[in-house]
Amino acid sequence: MASPRLGTFCCPTRDAATQLVLSFQPRAFHALCLGSGGLRLALGLLQLLPGRRPAGPGSPATSPPASVRILRAAAACDLLGCLGMVIRSTVWLGFPNFVDSVSDMNHTEIWPAAFCVGSAMWIQLLYSACFWWLFCYAVDAYLVIRRSAGLSTILLYHIMAWGLATLLCVEGAAMLYYPSVSRCERGLDHAIPHYVTMYLPLLLVLVANPILFQKTVTAVASLLKGRQGIYTENERRMGAVIKIRFFKIMLVLIICWLSNIINESLLFYLEMQTDINGGSLKPVRTAAKTTWFIMGILNPAQGFLLSLAFYGWTGCSLGFQSPRKEIQWESLTTSAAEGAHPSPLMPHENPASGKVSQVGGQTSDEALSMLSEGSDASTIEIHTASESCNKNEGDPALPTHGDL
């Protein structure tokens, strides 16, 4: 489970709200986290085993677009963060005496404290970076549709994702563990920077990504209508695929992380009470404990559920997956080429304008393919479809494709 509370566990002088969830069935909780994390890693490996659509021998060897690199970075962060959860839960279950020394009020041993702080910061840093990468994906999707940019900004995405995540994580840890791990300062003013590290990018993804996705869907509709001046059934289907995909992404994020926001709100509310053990606060304590266990189940599941949202099931053939609905990229490109035939009433001697139009059309196809499929295969399909159109270059009515 990815929560800033993992870092406060390392402080012997932890607050009462943190102690409430820490002391509630700790072995059952870590066993649940271990099982959920192990299941996520196993399903993730099944997703990677066979390739769904291997590229043909004649496929162009092009570098992956920026969105694919962003998704790979987000997946790597999630995978490593989940691995950190599994290792931490394994140590908590297998070496209870090693962990108990962290809670010693008189003295804190160096190695248990180092493992506690290191594993907590590892999990928090990687999941924070994962959220920043998901925000970069939404930004890149919008920029690609608006101005066909992406690869040129991948370095900026790396700086923003890793730089902001590292900066916030280091600052939060320095404030939380001041002056030392064994004598952490109590109070919200020291803990708030630590919580900002995790919840700032999470809230940014939950609030800003839907806005960017909606703007992207609107821009996609305008792009599809502007290519031929009409909105065909095939193009309407393409726009619907992109819209549904964005909806699935946000649904997974809300399902996996809403419990964290609810739990943290309840614990902050308890911290502001003079006595959290009061009878009137029993429903709040019960809700906090319940959402704490829900977090242990849903947080590690994010990576696998996002892979389903992006690509569907791509792993071992289990015999029950439904056939995928492919978009007719070839017919789209062909129809665009047919729309480029000059009218008998129009002059024929302007190949440059036809070439620019066709290049722009191919770029928009690649952008749409990148959003609807999110893999290299979709871009390859478009190149294949474009090559099939290039075979008709002998026809003077067909404009030639330019190199991108």
Swiss-Prot record:
Effect of residue 292 to G: In OA1; results in altered glycosylation pattern and subcellular localization consistent with protein retention in the endoplasmic reticulum
Single biological process term from Gene Ontology: phospholipase C-activating G protein-coupled receptor signaling pathway
One Gene Ontology term of the molecular function aspect: L-DOPA receptor activity
GO cellular component terms listed in the entry, alphabetical order: apical plasma membrane; cell junction; cytoplasm; Golgi apparatus; lysosomal membrane; melanosome; melanosome membrane; membrane
Compositional bias annotation for Polar residues: 355-366
Spans within the Cytoplasmic topological domain: 50-78, 146-149, 213-248, 314-404
PTM comment: Glycosylated. Phosphorylated.
A Pfam cross-reference name: Ocular_alb
Effect of substituting residue 35 to D: In OA1; results in altered glycosylation pattern and subcellular localization consistent with protein retention in the endoplasmic reticulum
Membrane-related topology note: Multi-pass membrane protein
Stretch list, region Disordered: 338-404
Known tissue expression: Expressed at high levels in the retina, including the retinal pigment epithelium (RPE), and in melanocytes. Weak expression is observed in brain and adrenal gland.
Domain comment in the entry: The cytoplasmic domain 3 and the C-terminus tail domain contain the lysosomal sorting signals and are necessary and sufficient for intracellular retention and delivery to lysosomal and melanosomal, respectively in melanocytic and non-melanocytic cells.
Family: Belongs to the G-protein coupled receptor OA family.
Assembly description: Interacts with heterotrimeric G(i) proteins. Interacts with ARRB1 and ARRB2. Interacts with MLANA.
Full protein name: G-protein coupled receptor 143
Organism: Homo sapiens
